[in-house]
Amino acid sequence: MAFLPQRNFVEDILANNYNLNNGTTAFTSTNIAEYNTFSIQVNTTGLGGSNRFVLEQSNDGSNWIPINEDIYVLDLGSGTLSIQKADFSGKYLRVRLLDAGNGTITIILISKR
C-alpha cells in the first residue's frame, strides 16, 4: 500500500467579504481547536492605511485575548500567517483591524489533518 504525502488544502472559508471599519472584526464560527495544524490566509481589499491587524482568540466567543504580541501588516493586501498550534489554545479566532478605512476581508483556514 502506497502512502500519499500529506498536503495542505483549504478546509473552510471562515469569513468572506466582511465589511470592516476601524476597530471592527471578522471572526470564525468554526471551532478551529479541533484541527491538528493550521495556518491562516487573510486577503484584504480596499482598506485604507497600512492594513494593520491583530489576531485574537476566545474559548466562548465573547472574551478575546491576543494570540501573540504581533501586529500584522499587509501592504499588498494579502498574505499567509503562520500560526503554530502551540500558540493557540482557544476555540475561535478573529481578526481585528487597527487602521481606519473601509474594505472587505476574507479569512481562509488552510489545514493539515
Model segments located where?
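Exposed aromatic-hydrophobic patches
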Residues: 27-30, 79-86
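Noncatalytic modules at the cell exterior or secretory-pathway interfaces
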Residues: 36-42, 86-104
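Edge beta-strands of jelly-roll/beta-sandwich modules across compartments, strongly enriched
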Residues: 101-113
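Solvent-exposed serine/threonine-rich low-complexity stretches and specific carbohydrate-binding patches
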Residues: 11-14, 66-76
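Transition segment at domain starts
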Residues: 1-35
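Aromatic, loop-rich ligand-recognition surfaces of beta-strand-rich domains
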Residues: 28-50, 109-111
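Conserved Ser/Thr-centered positions that define the repeating blades of beta-propeller domains
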Residues: 57-58
